[in-house]
Amino acid sequence: MSAIPLNRILPLGFLFHLLIFSFISLSSCMEFVEDPNNQGRISLQQRLGNQWAVGHLMGKKSLQDTDFEEMESFAKRNVENMRAALLQEQNRAESERELRHAQLVVRNILEQYLKNMQN
């Protein structure tokens, strides 16, 4: 019987599959290659337009339009508003504490009254 040994077939099969896969990958890559003549036109179109928020220029436009004197007065008004809100919150918390205390006193009075009524 003249059979071809397995150790001779495996390297040939590996080589065949390697060539097939490289050809398939090369053909699929060729579909996505752009025309070199269009590349200049595409990059030129990308440069047109507003670039104030691109890369290292991110946010620079908004900083240039700010008036620093206006920022200081805004900060003063903001601190005053925060102080007023804090005082209002403290007053509300104190009134809630007073309300809880009054409720506790009324509850104690009612409990004492009910105990006296049952006796």
From Swiss-Prot:
Tissues where this protein is expressed: Localized to the cutaneous granular glands in the skin and the brain.
Source superkingdom: Eukaryota
Keywords: Amidation, Amphibian defense peptide, Cleavage on pair of basic residues, Secreted, Signal
Alphabetical GO biological process terms: defense response; neuropeptide signaling pathway
Localization in the cell: Secreted
Transmembrane region(s): none
Propeptide: 30-44, 62-119
Name of a matching Pfam family: Bombesin
Disulfide bonds: none
Signal peptide interval: 1-29
Gene Ontology cellular component annotations, sorted alphabetically: extracellular region
Residue numbers bearing the Methionine amide modification: M58
Family assignment from sequence similarity: Belongs to the bombesin/neuromedin-B/ranatensin family.
Known role: Stimulates smooth muscle contraction. Role in induction of hypothermia, stimulation of DNA replication and release of many gastrointestinal hormones.
Record protein name field: Bombesin
Species of origin: Bombina orientalis
Higher taxonomy: Eukaryota, Metazoa, Chordata, Craniata, Vertebrata
